[in-house]
Amino acid sequence: MKIGFDNDKYLAMQSAHIRERIAQFDNKLYLEFGGKLFDDYHASRVLPGFQPDSKLQMLLQLKEQAEVVIVISAEDIVANKMRGDYGITYDVDVLRLIDAFQGVGLFVGSVCVTKYTDAPEVTAFEQKLNGLGIRTFRHYKIPGYPNDVAHIVSDDGYGKNDYIETERPLVVITAPGPGSGKMAVCLSQLYHEYKRGVKAGYAKFETFPIWNLPLKHPVNLAYEAATADLNDVNMSDPFHLEAYGKTTVNYNRDVEIFPVVNAMFELIAGKSPYRSPTDMGVNMAGNCIIDDDVCREASLNEIVRRYFKCLCDQKASGVVKPERFKLELLMNQAGIALGEREVEKRAHAMSEATDGQPAAAIELADGTIVTGKTGPLLGAASSALLNALKKLAGIDQETDLVSARAIEPIQTLKTNYLGSRNPRLHTDEILIALSSSVSENEYAAKAMEQIPNLKGCDIHSTVILSSVDADTLKKLGMYLTCEPTYEEDDRMYHKK
């Protein structure tokens, strides 16, 4: 994989910048932490070289100074709001986050329930945490929020919230998802800190959009693609331009709320430490791009992936996705279209050469493309996977890594005993068959050694793959796109 981002430089520069921001205030900084902390795969795709856990590793460099406060809205607890990526509710995700933070040595100080309401589900959640030794605090709905600044910044506003007791200079405010109230918690804490004579500060940590890249840079367009369902819009920061005469990039929600936040700062502290939304941020990612062309290409590919996913989701649901039109606009702005990538062209060519049967193509790190076709033993994705491993291992494409004799009993098991209509082996099944062939087949052993080199490779399928195949390819770290059509497109029900 071509590298466009210096991860080591990022870890050092980002942690140093946060330390500088802590020092600007009374050795107390509330850091609103947006985005994914443990598994930022979007960042790793658009900034090749950025590790999915880079933000976590950066925090670990500050772990002696840092404590974590997790924020969850009472409304989300009562509504059983789900995290789509993990398939768990927000309240369960709080427990997962606590385990994850503590597991790497970060101190979790407490959990704050925002928009508190006296509901049985909320009480049970608090009691469970307290029983586990985790302190809980309550923040309440404030009438007139966020525009009635005078009321909010008063004893009848923030003053009614619990003061979250913290021990360390850096307080990281994070949450299971958006809309949990992270910024409100930070500002409420500032109010209480100033009441106690502590001149604490606030900063915002978000990787995207990258403030010191151009507005229409593919990395920033890819962020808009990733948040198309939220309708976030990147825009130039007018406050930063007015204050410093410099053009920077932020997104609409931060720009729109800045006058309100600024007024709150002035009421809390007497004056605001910031002159623009960009000033509030601490993101150093833009300074760690070492190959702009690599990041541009990766980001353009990501926009295409997002569009294909939207089309496939639309096909599966039968409902037009509003974000589709936003994604089409972004593709137009980026100057890209479907069918332009070589991996797509080769997959379609293989399908045409096999009378329209499903086909797949994989682009390896060096740009080489291998294809796979539908056969009696393997699906197209499974075939492409084996062919990619052969290519990586320097094995002739005609060599069998797994014999038909080994595959046929698995097919019998699937169709005769497990109720499957499709006898062909899925990607997970062929990998298991490959691993079981290692002791008897030296080529299978060589191919197995190449599996890590599939990470970061694009794979394109001419039909929507099953969730089994999609999950396996995701576990391998491959980037899947599918045409929005099913193998048996005339059927009304399609197994996921």
State the predicted function of each range:
Residues 1-174, 189-350, 354-357, 364-366, ...:
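Flexible phosphate-sensing "switch/lid" loops adjacent to ATP/NTP-binding sites
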Residues 177-178:
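The conserved Walker
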Residues 182, 359-361:
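Transmembrane alpha-helical segments and their cytosolic interface motifs
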Residues 185:
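Hydrophobic positions on the alpha1 helix immediately C-terminal to the Walker A/P-loop
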Residues 373-374:
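Short clusters of small/polar residues that mark proteolytic maturation junctions
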Residues 377-393:
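A short, polar/charged loop-to-alpha-helix boundary motif
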Residues 391-423:
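Short HxH-centered metal-ligating active-site micro-motif
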